Amino acid sequence: MIEIDKVLNTILNESIELPKVLVQGLTNNSLKVKKGYIFFAFKGENNDGNDFIEDAFKNGACLAITDSDKLESQKNVVKVKDVRIAAGIACSNFYNYPQNKVKLIGITGTNGKTSTSTILKSILDATNQKTLQIGTSGIQPSVEIKPGLTTPDIFDLYEILN
C-alpha cells in the first residue's frame, strides 16, 4: 500500500484533487480491479479501456487514468498526455523502482532468443548470480505471478521484478 500522490508523483498536475486513499494495486484490466486500485484505460486494437472505466469503479477502483478527452470531466477520472507512459511511471513509483535494483538484459532478434537467454541464464547461475528469465518458455525460476502473455504487461512485469 502506498499513498496515491506518491504513486502519481511526476505524472499529474499538482492542481488536481485526488481521493485520499492508499493504493492497493494498478491494472488496465477492469476484471482485475479490487478496492483501492488505480485503473489505466489503455486503448487497444480491439478494445478501448475507456469503455470499462465504469466497470473498474464498480469493482473498487479509486481512480481511473485516461488519455481520452471524452471522460476527463468524470469524478475520479484523470486525463494524462499518454496513459501508457503514465502506467509505467506509476508502476515504478508503486513498486519502489525495482528496475534500479537489478541488472536487466534484453535479447531481441528473429531466431535464437530463447536459446541465447537459456545459455546466458546457465552461465550466470553457474557464477552464483540470482537470475530470472522471462520469455516464451515462461518465467524461470517460477514465480507466483502467471502472466497471460508471452511477455508480461507492464503491471505484471513490475510485480515480478518487485
Question: Language-model segments: which ranges?
Answer:
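Phosphate-binding loop of NTP-binding sites
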Residues: 8, 86-162
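N-terminal leader/targeting and accessory segments in enzymes
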Residues: 1-89, 93
